[in-house]
Amino acid sequence: MNKRSLIAGVLSVCLMLAMLPAAFAVEQGEANITPQTTMKELRENPSIKGSGYYTYCREMLPIESLYWQNKTLAQYAKPELVEDCAQAMNLVIENYNNGVQVTWQIYTPEEIEANPSLGGAQLFYYPASTPGGKYALVVPGNGNGVTSEMEEGGSAAYQLHEMGYTVFVLRYRSFLAASDNAPLQDLGRAVQLITENADKFQVQSENYALVCFSAGGQLGGLFANREIGYGNYPVPKPGVLLLSYPFVDFTYGKLAYHVLIDPGTREWRYYTTI
């Protein structure tokens, strides 16, 4: 091989190496979500998809996605929440584009392998602009069917983030996956995950706030009780408890819940307390 051929070969290798980062670069979306963005456009945003943020707040069945995909965010979310909801999704996009891990599994891979329903329990992370402060954990409602991580969760997260807090939004098991006190267990494990990784999340582990809505409000109220809540994990007790229109009366649902999700059990369940 002559000198010229050797130089050409070296240059070719260098050129290929220089192109590798571009070839393997993660596709990023633009933070351009508005109330007029359709749900299909929102869900196909590369950064929303890549982040793993769960946006199916109204679809009980997969086929319902076909109905909602061409509806706008303004049609999907409540009018009083839609602006903050859009900004929350833009914040998710910005965080993802900046290398932030948005979605965190609450349970270990081994636990999820043994019980796949645990894979649906997740935290969505909104880091504060200034690290080292207190955090808020948002527990959205679920209509006893599907949870509202994007609508109630996202809109509350955006407002709290603007106040300077690090915010986590909890996706917990619901409806037929809610047996054996699953939603309460998910909340406990979520706080445990944050507490054990406080340095990684750059938050203070104590005096956190629980910001809860509807059925999530019921879970937050139970979790604030040491005997049946936070003391079982163990984690620090909440410093602040904000319950917005909490669901507090299972009088007409206890029998249905027992039959559907906990048939035959006589042990305490989260929906039998009130």
Residue positions per predicted region:
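Short beta-strand element of the alpha/beta-hydrolase
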Residues: 133-142
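N-terminal targeting or regulatory segments adjacent to alpha/beta-hydrolase or S9 domains
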Residues: 2-9, 21-116
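Short amphipathic alpha-helix adjacent to the substrate-entry channel of hydrolases
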Residues: 150-168
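Catalytic nucleophile-loop/oxyanion-hole region of alpha/beta-hydrolase
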Residues: 148-152, 170-205
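Hydrophobic core
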Residues: 11, 15-19
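Primarily recognizes the serine-hydrolase "nucleophile elbow" in alpha/beta-hydrolase
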Residues: 189-260
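A short loop-to-beta-strand scaffold at the N-terminal edge of the catalytic core in hydrolase folds
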Residues: 115-127, 134-135
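Serine-hydrolase catalytic core
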Residues: 263-274
